[in-house]
Amino acid sequence: FDADLQALTAFYKKNGFIDVVIGPYEIQPLGEKHIEIVINVYEGTKYNFGGITIEGNEFFPSDELKDVFTMKIGEPFDQEVFDNELRNVYSKYFDEGFIYVFIVPNYVKEGDQLIVNLKINENNRARIRQIHITGNKRTKEKVIRRQLEISPGDYFRQTQVMRSQQNIYNLGFFEQDIRLDYTPINKDGDIDLQLDV
C-alpha cells in the first residue's frame, strides 16, 4: 500500500503538483468482506515550467547545461523528467573528471510558474593516480590492462571507465559484475582506481 501512495505522489509531481501532500488516510469497513480506503490529498498549485537559471558553473557554459533539459516553458513541470535530466547533468560532469560535483536545485515559484535555479559546486577534477586490479586468476594482468580506456594521469571519465569494464567482460574470462571503486588520495581529489574482476 505504501508503494501505491508513493506512486500517487509521483503521478501528481509528474503533472506539475510539486507541493502535493498525500495522506493521512482512513480505512472504513464496507460490510463484512470489504473495506474502503479514503485518502486525503492536498494538491496545491499546479506549476508550469518557467525555465532554468544556473550559477557556479565554470567548466561548462550555462547554455550547454540548459540544453540537457527538454521541458518547454509553459508545460506542466514534470518532477520525474527533471530528476532524470539532472542526473544527466551529473553524468556530463562525471565524464570530465568532476566526480565531486554537487548540484542543488532551488525552486522559485512565481504565480503558477516554477523556475529552477541550479547552484553548482564543481569542486576539483579527479585524476587517476594508479589502477589496481584484483581478483584475477584467469589471465595475465597485461591482458586486462590492454582493455582499459583509461590510464594513470588521465582525468576520471565515467564513460571510459564503463567501456573499460565492458571490454574486460568481453574477454570472456570474467563474470559481468566487474566492480570498480575509487579512493581519494590527496586534497586535490585525485584517486586510485580499484578494479575487482
Feature locations, PLM:
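Periplasmic polypeptide-binding modules associated with outer-membrane biogenesis and secretion
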Residues: 1-197
